[in-house]
A protein has these predicted regions:
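Short, glycine-biased loop/turn motifs at secondary-structure junctions and
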Residues: 1-168
Length: 168
């Protein structure tokens, strides 16, 4: 299965600290681990999971072996990095963060009275990056329109990313 993975700039996982062998023209080495979501296993993302986990660098990863599809990720017993998604760079990451911040502002101000409690946290949260700002926009949508609005906002974010990154 082809999926995606966010890593730090040096190829380490932000949660485990595992340093991946980065591909150099051909796929990286296979990494194996027991499947135990959030504890062990090779965690990958489907396209719709990207806004939830948006990190520093984005990689295409091949998952194989035992697999468990979770709500916001896929966990497999084997995986290897295929290539970096070069379009996801610091400028693109900042653009996505800004888009999410602008969307959060628009949503917070779309109702009367405006949701000033949300409006006050958007700009200070920008340094935290795109995962937090995409969450804020989705939560504001949910506060206004319920769970369906949350999911619609997440789908909107996914569409924005997919279109600009050329992902399917």
């Amino acid at each position: 299965m082809i999926a995606y993975k966010f890593l730090r700039a040096d190829g380490t996982s932000p949660f485990t600290g595992y340093r991946w062998e980065l591909p150099k023209g051909e796929p990286g080495a296979w990494v194996e681990a027991q499947v135990d979501p959030c504890r062990s296993g090779i965690h990958g993302l489907r396209l719709g999971d990207l806004p939830l986990w948006a990190g520093r660098t984005l990689w295409e990863i091949e998952l194989d072996g035992e697999m468990r599809k979770e709500r916001s990720k896929v966990v497999a017993s084997r995986g290897r990095l295929l290539h970096r998604i070069d379009a996801w760079d610091d400028d693109f990451r900042a653009e996505f963060t800004r888009m999410c911040a602008d969307r959060a502002h628009d949503l917070a101000n779309s109702v009367s009275p405006p949701l000033s409690n949300w409006e006050a946290v958007v700009e200070p949260s920008i340094p935290e990056g795109p995962a937090l700002l995409s969450f804020a926009a989705a939560r504001i949508a949910e506060e206004i329109g319920g769970p369906d609005a949350y999911h619609a906002e997440r789908a909107r974010q996914t569409g924005w990313l997919a279109g600009r990154l050329g992902l399917e």
